[in-house]
């Protein structure tokens, strides 16, 4: 069995193809396919099964070589006696046994089992699926094919293409034969002319038959052109070699081009399937595209499009367009229109020109057909695909005519087309593109993948040639690839089978690409050609896809392929198959032969490819796989679904993938190349799967099957995309055997398949429990990813996906689905006709297999995905989001930028790379995970990835792609990879990653994950979505679902699965979905963190988390699943994160640790995030994921970046990017690891980590620290850097952050990403946070934040979005705060825990923070570590990052994270957070509750902590302390504080860090830190801030400034100080500050002040300075410092804020810092604001500040007291208290640190009043916080201004000038509302950020404020620049100034406990963020008891959920209660009550 040889992927396959080719093919031609689903071993892969005995074993000589440790040398034998007989499976006495999954059956030695089509098999722990291929029939055709081969051989030139035309005809014939294609054939011919017209080439080839040629020609030319070969044949040939060369070149080229093209293609593909083609065409030559389009459109559409297919076409088209790839597949079926198809093929061929075209041309007959089909198809497909409609139309026409035939054709075409298309053009470049496309196309990702794949493909292509050559030497000779392809097709068609196969190989390559590109179409193409293509595709796909996506996809496809092989196409398009039956048969035979072989080969190839590509792919695949998987699937789905979005997503993904791939490639390149060639690398195997594809060349045939699969898969991918239907379908698929067949015929099938695939995967996964869930998530995520991307796209996408999927699905689905169904129905016949039966079976089998594979893949992918998802999701999401946002393009730019950065990073990362690589590998490996050390790394990476993913995703992501991306970059290499993996594509890295990540990330980051994801902002919602926004927040699960929105959607759709999936990551993903996945993914990261922290953190987190968990739980649970910790989600997250993370992390961590530290970071970060995230838990978690990721990535990324970046610069970029990226990336990157390595420092580095590390590190991180520490070191420096970075970020970040923060956030998103990165990154935490932040945001939004969190990716994205938005910020805010809170909580929790510890943290934090930090610090580290680390890290980290991030996110997260750290603070903050939550309380409550409860708990803890820790007293005190400002502080503070606090905390930590941190936060952090700074400041802040801090006002001002400044200064100083850290000490001192407590209020403050004074020493510097500046601050600071802690804590937050103040002196710096902070804040002002506002909010605060300043302070205290009282008031507090306690407890838990800290702090802190206050304070704080916030804000604002360290956040506007002004004036860009002190916008808008800022009472200013301030050289008083928008004020009947005034006086929702149902818009996470910012408490679940001021906000669709509230008499209100109420600052529930009548009527 050549099959065995196949193992030699390339050579073997070639040989196989070649040799086998010669044989008529039965032999040669695979009769079945064994799809190995993606798993921890690698991406999905298809192995062709030939007649005779196919040995499955570990030995290379085995037909199905599975080089995995669990597989025996000769594990089992699959004996196929005849193509029409069921294969017999026998176990060969393997050690781990062989089992049949459905029904369950264990095969004992000697026991025989007859395999049914699509039966799921488990070899040891490797899930596979058998697909029957319908090969034989095609044999006859093959003869001609063979002939074709000759032409091909001879031809190799375009002219030969004519042959193709002939072939096409023949093919058509075959098709016709099979299907009625003949008529279509004619049509085809006719169509072809159209094609011709379309394609210039065609004209030359004018003749009808030649048309095919023409098409080919056209394509060829195009391709040629593309390749530059100029002539198709030549080109093909040349290209072929070129491909090889080009491959690499392309890879490079393609990377760029890819990027470019990819972008274009992606975009286009995304937008249309076309893109891929377009890209290819574009790349190749527009003509091709045109051709394709024309053909497709003209031909196809004109032809029959009009026909019913119009409809289909339309849907297809639309879907096609939208889904394009997916749809494409569907369309492809239509495309099948054999005639058209042929035409298409030709065109495709043309398009593919290169190999396919040429091959096709050469192949002419069969080849031609195929080629044409392929070529045309590809081209067409791409176009068509892009615009499946066209194709579909055509196809449809034909399809309608010959629905079956069409399907087949379509399939074939699709496959072929994509294949060819890519192959031709892509063959060389296109192919890779195609591959990429394919992968991407698969969904929209095709493009991405394509690019990546392209690159891979190139390599592969090189391989391909081999295969093709083998197969069709002539072909080979000719550009075999193409020729090969052709040949294969030919072969397939006829004896040409071989050629076909070869062709397939070549074509496959191309096709794969194309296929991927136009997966839907590919299906068609696939059918005929797709066999080959399929095989290829899978291979390529796998490889390209990162395997994952594709893998899953591919595998699905592959899985499908096998069936589809012959049937795969069918499967893919069962319809196609059926349609293609004739062709299919040919193909089938071919396929069978090829398929089996190919499949087999493919599988192997896939594996090999994975290996080879693996090397590349590994990363890519792993990454991609991971990422892609998610993406792939998701993307696929996403893309497919969202074409546009998908495109973006795809792009993102693609980018990610590509990047990944690239990186991977780089990484793996050796491997890839070698591996590629040596597909053997087992290691690569994993990758292999991915690589396999590459290898697939030889395996071409197999590949073909694979490809078929692939296309099918693509389709499946697509399908998965359509999880809903698809899912159903998928299952249906199984179910639908016959129907399936029909379905198969229908694209639907594939789609279904896809969906099914997804679902099954989902289910499967779920069933499997595979974590892959994330992948599943992918599935869901398909949605998820989609979500990610989708999500990113968010709801839209999800929607799209869902919608699309629904729409898409709907559109596609409906149409597609419906269409497919209908189509299927229609098609079925043909399929049936076609032998759909068998085929159908196969298809179904394939599908099954696919699904299985998908499952496996998904699973794996999920993991990957998870990672990716996270990343992807996150990233994707984010990416998507961002991408979506703009990001796409922007992204691209950014990508480039990122690429640079990445490169830089990469370089930098390089070192990390290795490690990172490992790490990356990890993610990437992820798949392999083991592979490489990746194990740990992988774990880490994976974790990271995952985490990242989670995080990322980046968000991934993605989210945070940017960040992640960057990070990824940094990490990149590894991380990216990881990230990429996670992020998806970091590896691919640069570009891809960038793009992907970036995209992803971007989206996440900028993007998302979110992202993820992707993601929400755009997706935000969804993006935030990411799940995030999604709903994630909503409820996690639910929210998640919503969040998931897409996810949920999916989730919903899939929920179950998703859920199931979810549970695994997906759940996360799903539920948390995003978050979770991220979390999950992130988790890992968190684990990182955790791990790092793990112990503590984890526990801490966990504990804390736990509470958060609670809320989280659901999320958690997803998380749980993910986390598993589930409930504990936080825990989970924490745990999970920690645990998971831990464990995941652990390994990861470990690695990371070392690695990372990162881990640390990661952990930390993640932790942070996690905490944060977790805290946010849901969000958090998501965040977490995100966060972590961010965190990590952040850190790492950042880190890396930082590190690299530390490079800061890059980092900035990175960070920025990474921020986002990181986030996303980070997310992925998260990888942190890389970060870790570096990063950490960097991030942790920066972020906190570093500092944190320092501090935290020391402290929490200590451990981390440790790791980190060093890092810290760095960090310090870097951190510092961080600071800078942070700051940097700040700067950049600012930019970024700003950008990111805002802009970016939005658009920037990317930047944001960046920003986030920076901040975020810092954020990292932030991101995390951010995410968190976002989360916060989201959460703030919380929902949003949450979402954000989730979003994180989203956040990230959102981040961007959220982030951006983050606005969400709110999220951040909220989240930040909320998040913070939430996150906080969780974070808190963790943080709390940590944070809580935070408490200690506070204490610690304060103390801890400071002390702790300082002293505790260590402990903290410990604890913090735990939490802290988490917190610390997170917090700190976050903080630091958080800081930055933290600041921003930081703030938020920071808070959160920080928070965590602060979290505690937050907590306190949480309170703050809560506050943040603001609601903190509420939120806490609410969320707190919800979380609060849990959060509360958490929150409490948090608050508590803060309180407690805050020293509670501190916090509380502080908190209460005005810190309450806390309130503000708290909330604001919390948030800010929180953030800040965290910062403080962190700072604290950081601070200690302080120095570092502080410093770290230091400024940079400042940014972050501001937060960080906070941290730093914190320290100082702490100190000052603290003192001041609270002074918050000062802080604000001071704080802000101070804080900021301080931070800055402090930072600096602090740094010193922190050093002082001590400051901390002061803190401690301050701490003692008991007075603090006392002072607490005044005294505290005062004390603080005084203390500060004391502190001043150190502080003084900054503090002092600031103080002076801040004046109050100073004192405050000092006191604060002293108090610091507490205050700090409390104040911390506040302090932070305040701190900031102190910075004043520093201020200047601080400004910087603040800037940073601001920056962080993004809004500088905001920060200020927040600070200010917050401060103001607290008037008390203010006073506080004053206090700090002392005057106020009394006041503040007073207020604080009041607040405090309030707080007490807030009973929540109590809970908080308890929580606090908990926190305290946690402290213990966290304890350790915390405890220590706690002890210290606690005592002091606690004692500090705190206690009493705690509860109270907490609440108070919370409340106050909220209120405070405003107050603070307000105050802050003033001070801030004064303080000069405003943390400015932008919403609705992207003002690079303004961002620069902020940074130049020493302010920072806030990443979330939570950490912002000023919100800058151009008009009144009801965005989450705007409402959160208004709720917090922070100044909402016009752009003129910044411009005038820039002119004045300092921040001008905001009062004169409040936004004026008479029109809107009139519309809404309110006055903004009055509303702000009321918000500062009192939190609008103080005392309110609000539950938001999942269907509400904005999503619950965002609503939660708003609620938190307004002082309300978010109830995570439906209240079960009555309580005054407890209300439920719902919408008509959720009325059924509101029976309980109605029964209880709880007011059930419309969302306008919040939206309008917050805008007017009037709480009038009675005016918005929804009556039972309305409900009933609804």
Swiss-Prot record:
Lineage top rank: taxon: Eukaryota
PTM note: Phosphorylated upon exposure to ionizing radiation (IR), ultraviolet radiation (UV), and hydroxyurea (HU). Phosphorylation in response to IR requires ATM, NBN, and possibly CHEK2. Also phosphorylated during the G2/M phase of the cell cycle and during activation of the mitotic spindle checkpoint. Phosphorylation at Thr-4 by ATM stabilizes and enhances homodimerization via the FHA domain. Phosphorylated at Ser-168 and Ser-195 by CK2 in response to DNA damage during mitosis, promoting interaction with TOPBP1.
Modified residues (N6-acetyllysine): 802, 1384
Biased composition (Basic and acidic residues): 457-476, 661-679, 819-837, 885-919, 931-941
Positions of post-translational Omega-N-methylarginine modification: 1896
Residues carrying Phosphothreonine: 4, 146, 219, 293, 323, 370, 449, 512, 1146, 1187, 1228, 1269, 1385, 1399, 1440, 1507, 1522, 1541, 1563, 1579, 1593, 1634, 1754
Cell cycle in keyword set: yes
Domain FHA: 54-105
Annotated spans, Interaction with the PRKDC complex: 1137-1580
Region span, Required for nuclear localization (NLS2): 1661-2042
GO cellular component, one term: chromosome
Gene3D superfamilies referenced in this protein's UniProt entry, alphabetically: 2.60.200.20, BRCT domain
PANTHER family xref list: MEDIATOR OF DNA DAMAGE CHECKPOINT PROTEIN 1, PAX TRANSCRIPTION ACTIVATION DOMAIN INTERACTING PROTEIN
Record comment regarding domains: Tandemly repeated BRCT domains are characteristic of proteins involved in DNA damage signaling. In MDC1, these repeats are required for localization to chromatin which flanks sites of DNA damage marked by 'Ser-139' phosphorylation of H2AX.
Protein name: Mediator of DNA damage checkpoint protein 1
Provenance organism: Sus scrofa
């Amino acid at each position: 069995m050549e099959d065995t040889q196949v193992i030699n992927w390339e050579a073997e396959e070639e040989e196989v193809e070649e040799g086998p080719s010669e044989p008529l093919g039965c032999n040669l031609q695979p009769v079945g396919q064994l799809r190995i689903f993606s798993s921890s071993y690698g991406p999905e892969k298809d192995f062709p099964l030939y007649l005779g005995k196919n040995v499955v074993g570990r030995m290379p000589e085995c037909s199905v070589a599975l080089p995995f440790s669990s597989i025996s040398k000769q594990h089992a034998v699959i004996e196929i006696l005849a193509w029409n007989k069921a294969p017999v499976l026998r176990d060969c006495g393997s050690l781990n046994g062989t089992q049949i999954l459905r029904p369950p059956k264990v095969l004992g030695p000697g026991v025989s089992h007859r395999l049914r089509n699509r039966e799921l098999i488990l070899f040891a722990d490797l899930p596979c699926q058998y697909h029957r291929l319908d090969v034989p029939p095609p044999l006859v055709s093959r003869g001609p094919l063979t002939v074709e081969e000759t032409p091909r051989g001879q031809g190799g030139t375009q002219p030969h293409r004519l042959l193709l035309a002939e072939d096409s005809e023949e093919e058509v014939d075959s098709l016709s034969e099979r299907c009625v294609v003949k008529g279509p054939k004619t049509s085809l011919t006719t169509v072809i002319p159209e094609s011709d017209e379309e394609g210039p080439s065609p004209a030359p080839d004018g003749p009808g038959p030649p048309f095919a040629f023409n098409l080919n020609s056209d394509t060829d030319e195009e391709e040629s052109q593309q390749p530059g070969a100029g002539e198709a044949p030549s080109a093909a040939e040349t290209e072929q070699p070129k491909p090889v060369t080009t491959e690499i070149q392309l890879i490079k080229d393609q990377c760029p081009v890819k990027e470019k093209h990819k972008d274009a293609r992606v975009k286009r593909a995304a937008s249309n399937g076309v893109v891929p083609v377009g890209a290819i065409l574009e790349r190749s030559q527009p003509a091709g595209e045109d051709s394709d389009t024309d053909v497709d459109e003209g031909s196809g559409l004109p032809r029959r499009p009009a026909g019913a297919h119009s409809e289909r076409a339309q849907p297809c088209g639309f879907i096609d367009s939208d889904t394009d790839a997916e749809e494409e597949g569907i369309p492809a079926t239509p495309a099948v229109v054999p005639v058209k198809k042929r035409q298409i093929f030709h065109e495709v061929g043309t398009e593919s020109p290169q190999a396919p075209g040429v091959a096709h041309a050469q192949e002419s007959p069969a080849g031609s057909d195929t080629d044409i089909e392929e070529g045309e198809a590809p081209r067409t497909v791409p176009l068509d695909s892009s615009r499946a409609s066209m194709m579909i139309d055509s196809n449809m026409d034909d399809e309608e005519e010959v629905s079956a035939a069409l399907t087949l054709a379509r399939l074939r075409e699709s496959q072929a087309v994509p294949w060819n298309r890519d192959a031709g053009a892509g063959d060389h470049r296109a192919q890779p593109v195609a591959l990429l496309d394919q992968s991407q196309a698969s969904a929209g990702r095709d493009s991405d993948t394509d690019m990546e794949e392209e690159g891979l493909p190139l390599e592969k292509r090189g391989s391909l040639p081999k295969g093709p050559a083998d197969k069709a030497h002539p072909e080979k000779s000719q550009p075999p690839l193409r020729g090969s392809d052709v040949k294969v097709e030919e072969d397939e068609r006829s004896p040409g089978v071989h050629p076909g196969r070869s062709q397939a190989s070549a074509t496959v390559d191309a096709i794969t690409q194309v296929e991927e590109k136009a997966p839907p179409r590919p299906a068609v193409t696939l059918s005929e050609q797709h066999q080959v293509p399929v095989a290829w595709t899978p291979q390529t796909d796998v490889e390209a896809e990162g395997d994952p996506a594709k893998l899953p996809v591919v595998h699905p496809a592959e899985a499908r392929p096998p069936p589809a092989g012959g049937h795969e196409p069918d499967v893919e398009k069962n319809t196609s198959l059926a349609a293609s039956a004739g062709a299919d048969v040919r193909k089938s035979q071919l396929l069978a032969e090829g398929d089996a072989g190919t499949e087999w080969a493919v599988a192997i190839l896939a594996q090999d490819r994975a290996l080879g590509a693996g090397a590349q792919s590994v990363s890519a695949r792993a990454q991609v796989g991971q990422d892609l998987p998610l993406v792939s699937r998701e993307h696929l789905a996403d893309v497919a679904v969202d074409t546009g979005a998908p495109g973006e997503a795809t792009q993102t993904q693609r980018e990610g993938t590509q990047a990944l791939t690239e990186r991977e490639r780089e990484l793996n390149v050796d491997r890839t190349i070698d591996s590629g060639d040596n597909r053997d690398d087992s290691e690569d195997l994993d990758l292999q799967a991915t690589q396999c594809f590459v290898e697939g060349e030889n395996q071409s045939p197999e590949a073909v099957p694979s490809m078929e699969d692939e296309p099918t898969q693509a389709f499946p991918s697509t399908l998965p995309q359509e999880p809903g239907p698809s899912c159903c379908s998928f299952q249906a698929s199984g179910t639908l055997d016959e129907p399936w067949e029909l379905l198969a015929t229908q694209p639907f099938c594939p789609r279904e398949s896809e969906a099914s695939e997804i679902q099954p995967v989902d289910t499967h996964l779920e069933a499997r429990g595979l974590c892959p869930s994330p992948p599943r998530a992918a599935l869901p995520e398909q949605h998820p990813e989609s979500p990610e991307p989708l999500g990113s796209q968010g709801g839209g996408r999800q929607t799209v996906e869902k919608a699309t999927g629904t729409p898409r699905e709907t559109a596609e689905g409906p149409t597609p689905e419906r269409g497919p169904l209908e189509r299927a129905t229609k098609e079925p016949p043909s399929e049936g006709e076609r032998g759909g039966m068998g085929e159908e079976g196969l298809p179904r089998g394939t599908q099954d297999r696919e699904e299985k594979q998908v499952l496996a893949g998904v699973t794996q992918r999920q993991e990957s995905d998870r990672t990716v998802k996270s990343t992807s999701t996150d990233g994707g999401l984010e990416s998507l989001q961002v991408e979506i946002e703009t990001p796409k393009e922007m992204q691209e730019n950014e990508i480039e930028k990122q690429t640079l950065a990445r490169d830089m990073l990469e370089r930098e990362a390089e070192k990390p790379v290795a490690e990172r690589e490992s790490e990356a590998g990890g993610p990437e490996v992820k798949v392999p995970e083991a592979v490489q050390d990746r194990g740990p790394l992988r774990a880490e990476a994976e974790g990271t990835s995952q985490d990242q993913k989670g995080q990322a995703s980046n968000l991934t992501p993605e989210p945070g792609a940017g960040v992640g991306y960057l990070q990824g970059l940094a990490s990149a290499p590894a991380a990216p990879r990881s990230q990429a993996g996670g992020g998806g594509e970091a590896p691919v890295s640069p570009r891809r990653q960038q793009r992907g990540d970036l995209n992803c990330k971007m989206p996440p980051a900028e993007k998302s994950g979110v992202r993820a994801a992707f993601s929400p902002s755009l997706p935000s919602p969804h993006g935030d979505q990411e799940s995030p926004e999604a709903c994630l927040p909503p409820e996690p699960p639910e929210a998640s679902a919503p969040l998931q929105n897409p996810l949920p959607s999916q989730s919903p759709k899939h929920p179950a699965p998703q859920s199931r999936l979810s549970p695994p990551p997906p759940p996360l993903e799903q539920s948390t979905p995003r978050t979770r996945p991220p979390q999950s993914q992130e988790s890992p990261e968190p684990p990182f963190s955790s791990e790092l922290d793990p112990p503590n953190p984890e526990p801490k987190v966990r504990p804390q988390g736990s509470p958060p968990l609670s809320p989280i739980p659901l999320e958690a649970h997803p998380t749980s699943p993910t986390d598993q910790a589930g409930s504990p989600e936080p825990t989970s997250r924490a745990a999970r994160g920690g645990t998971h993370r831990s464990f995941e992390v652990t390994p990861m961590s470990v690695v990371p640790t070392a690695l990372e530290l990162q881990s640390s970071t990661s952990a930390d970060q993640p932790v942070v995030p996690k905490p944060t995230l977790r805290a946010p838990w849901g969000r958090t978690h998501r965040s977490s994921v995100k966060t972590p990721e961010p965190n990590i990535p952040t850190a790492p990324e950042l880190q890396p970046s930082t590190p690299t970046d530390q490079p800061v610069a890059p980092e900035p970029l990175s960070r920025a990017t990474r921020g986002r990226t990181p986030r996303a990336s980070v997310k992925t990157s998260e990888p942190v690891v890389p970060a870790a390595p570096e990063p950490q420092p960097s991030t942790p580095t920066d972020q906190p980590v570093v500092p944190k590390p320092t501090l935290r590190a020391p402290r929490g991180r200590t451990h981390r620290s440790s790791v980190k520490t060093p890092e810290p070191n760095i960090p310090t420096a870097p951190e510092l850097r961080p600071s800078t970075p942070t700051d940097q970020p700040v700067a950049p970040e600012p930019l970024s952050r700003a950008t990111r923060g805002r802009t970016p956030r939005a658009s920037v998103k990317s930047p944001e990403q960046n920003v986030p990165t920076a901040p975020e990154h810092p954020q990292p935490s932030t991101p995390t946070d951010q995410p968190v932040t976002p989360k916060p945001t989201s959460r703030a939004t919380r929902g949003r934040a949450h979402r954000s969190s989730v979003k994180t990716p989203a956040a990230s994205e959102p981040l961007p979005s959220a982030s951006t938005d983050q606005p969400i910020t709110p999220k951040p805010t909220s989240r930040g705060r909320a998040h913070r809170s939430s996150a906080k909580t969780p974070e808190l929790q963790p943080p709390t825990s940590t944070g809580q510890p935070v408490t200690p943290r506070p204490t610690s934090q304060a103390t801890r923070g400071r002390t702790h930090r300082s002293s505790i610090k260590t402990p903290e580290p410990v604890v913090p570590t735990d939490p802290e680390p988490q917190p610390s890290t997170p917090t700190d980290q976050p903080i630091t990052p958080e800081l930055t991030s933290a600041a921003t996110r930081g703030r938020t997260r920071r808070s959160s994270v920080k928070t965590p750290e602060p979290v505690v603070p937050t907590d306190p903050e949480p309170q703050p957070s809560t506050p943040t939550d603001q609601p903190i309380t509420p939120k806490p409550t609410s969320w707190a509750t919800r979380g609060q409860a849990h959060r509360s708990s958490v929150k409490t803890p948090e608050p508590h902590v803060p309180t407690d820790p805050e020293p509670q007293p501190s916090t509380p005190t502080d908190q209460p302390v005005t810190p309450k400002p806390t309130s503000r502080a708290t909330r604001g503070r919390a948030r800010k504080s929180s953030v800040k606090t965290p910062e403080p905390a962190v700072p604290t930590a950081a601070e200690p860090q302080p120095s570092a941190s502080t410093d770290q936060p230091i400024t940079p952090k400042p940014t972050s830190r501001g937060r960080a700074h906070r941290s730093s400041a914190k320290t100082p802040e702490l100190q000052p801030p603290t003192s001041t801090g609270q002074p918050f006002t000062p802080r604000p001002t001071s704080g802000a400034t101070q804080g900021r400044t301080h931070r800055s200064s402090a930072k600096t100083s602090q740094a010193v100080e922190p050093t002082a850290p001590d400051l901390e000490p002061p803190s401690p001192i301050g701490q003692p500050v008991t007075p603090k407590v006392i002072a607490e209020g005044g005294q505290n403050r005062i004390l603080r002040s005084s203390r500060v004074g004391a502190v001043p020493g150190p502080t003084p510097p900054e503090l002092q300075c600031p103080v002076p500046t801040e004046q109050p601050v100073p004192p405050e600071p000092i006191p604060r410092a002293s108090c610091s802690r507490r205050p700090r804590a409390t104040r911390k937050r506040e302090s932070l804020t305040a701190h900031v103040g102190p910075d004043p002196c520093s201020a200047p710096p601080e400004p910087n810092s603040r800037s940073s902070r601001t920056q962080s804040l993004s809004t500088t002002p905001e920060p200020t604001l927040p600070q200010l506002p917050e401060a103001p909010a607290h008037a008390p605060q203010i006073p506080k500040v004053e206090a700090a300043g002392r005057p106020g302070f009394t006041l503040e205290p007073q207020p604080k007291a009041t607040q405090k009282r309030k707080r007490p008031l807030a009973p929540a507090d109590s809970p908080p208290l308890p929580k606090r306690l908990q926190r305290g407890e946690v402290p213990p838990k966290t304890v350790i640190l915390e405890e220590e800290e706690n002890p210290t702090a606690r005592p002091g802190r606690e004692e500090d009043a705190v206690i009493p206050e705690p509860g109270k304070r907490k609440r108070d704080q919370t409340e106050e916080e909220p209120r405070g916030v405003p107050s603070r804000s307000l105050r802050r604002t003033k001070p801030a201004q004064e303080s000069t360290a405003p943390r400015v956040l932008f919403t609705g506007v992207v003002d690079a000038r303004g961002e620069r002004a902020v940074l130049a004036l020493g302010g920072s860009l806030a990443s979330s509302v939570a950490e912002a002190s000023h919100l800058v916008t151009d008009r009144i808008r009801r965005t989450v950020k705007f409402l959160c800022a208004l709720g917090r009472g922070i100044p909402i200013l016009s752009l003129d404020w910044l411009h005038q301030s820039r002119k004045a050289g300092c921040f001008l008083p905001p009062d004169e620049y409040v936004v004026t928008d008479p029109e809107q004020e009139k519309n809404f009947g309110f006055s903004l100034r009055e509303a702000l005034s009321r918000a500062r006086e009192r939190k609008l929702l103080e005392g309110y406990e609000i539950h938001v149902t999942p269907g509400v818009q904005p999503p619950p996470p965002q609503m939660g963020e708003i609620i938190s910012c307004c002082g309300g408490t978010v109830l995570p679940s439906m209240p079960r008891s009555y309580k005054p001021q407890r209300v439920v906000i719902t919408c008509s669709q959720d009325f059924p959920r509101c029976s309980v509230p109605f029964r209880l008499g709880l007011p059930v209100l419309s969302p306008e209660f919040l939206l309008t109420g917050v805008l007017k600052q009037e709480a009038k529930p009675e005016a918005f009550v929804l009556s039972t009548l309305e409900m009933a009527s609804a």
